[in-house]
A protein has these predicted regions:
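Sequence/structural signature of beta-propeller domains
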Residues: 1-249
């Protein structure tokens, strides 16, 4: 299967098996396929987009005054884009709502997170959909975790308002100090929050787990038992404490 930078992929079972490490047999097994959303093929895009982060909304809820619906997509791109005659910047987060739920061939775009308003450039992000405890902090539904312009830290953004006018409730804080005790030697490239216990293939992910990818190889990740990761590997953080200089996982 071939794809472009504007297409979304999904990773599913191969021959009935969907396996992840480190659970035996400790070999990642599955198949990539196209997920049915192609930003390049939409009539109102410029045909040359590069998606660098995406989240599928899994339930109806309101975040920072914006009513989100199950199946909505939150998207950021690696460069500035013009979609439907509207200019978006790298670091903005776009909201795509399909015209027909589950059919991503047509829909509408709007601005969900305006980087200019809050002086934060989202290079990786995950939106909490439920209240969940991460380490020693309780996150609320609607809290946004993000990396600012290729950072090794994960910030917590608490909203007063999302949308074309984005307003923070207080100053965004460092939730995960990646280049402190965790020893990240590379920037974070992707991020996801598990806000309810989830079974994927042969792995159970407890609520509060963070899934992270780095942009390059790093042989010493973690404050306890360290692991080595290669470029674009996904690994989990089971966080015990948060904050600058005090993050452990």
């Amino acid at each position: 299967t071939s794809w472009t930078a504007g297409q979304v992929l999904k990773f599913g079972p191969s021959g009935g098996s969907l396996l992840f490490e480190p659970v035996a047999p400790a070999i990642t097994t599955g198949t990539f396929s196209l997920a049915g959303f192609n930003l390049d093929s939409l009539s109102f895009s410029d045909g040359n987009t590069q998606i660098d982060a995406l989240q599928v909304v899994t339930r109806d809820f309101t975040a920072g005054g914006v009513a989100l619906q199950k199946g909505d997509l939150l998207i950021s791109t690696s460069g500035n884009e013009t979609i439907g005659g509207v200019a978006y910047e790298h670091g903005d987060i776009l909201l795509f709502r399909p015209t027909t739920p589950g059919n991503y061939s047509t829909g509408t775009f709007s601005l969900f997170f305006d980087r200019t308003d809050v002086a934060l450039q989202a290079s990786a992000f995950t939106l909490g959909e439920r209240a969940v405890v991460v380490g020693d902090v309780t996150l609320n539904a609607g809290d946004l975790l993000l990396c600012d312009n290729g950072s090794r830290d994960i910030l917590r953004f608490v909203p007063t308002q999302y949308g074309a006018t984005t307003i923070a409730n207080g100053t965004p804080s460092v939730l995960i100090d990646g280049d402190g005790n965790l020893g990240f030697g590379q920037d974070i490239g992707a991020l996801a929050l598990v806000d309810q216990t989830t079974v994927i293939g042969n792995v159970t992910l407890p609520a509060g787990t963070l899934i992270v990818s780095l942009v390059n190889e790093d042989a010493t990740v973690g404050s306890g038992t360290q692991i080595g990761v290669t470029r674009r590997d996904l690994f989990t953080l089971s966080v015990t404490t948060t904050g600058v200089g005090t993050t452990s996982a």
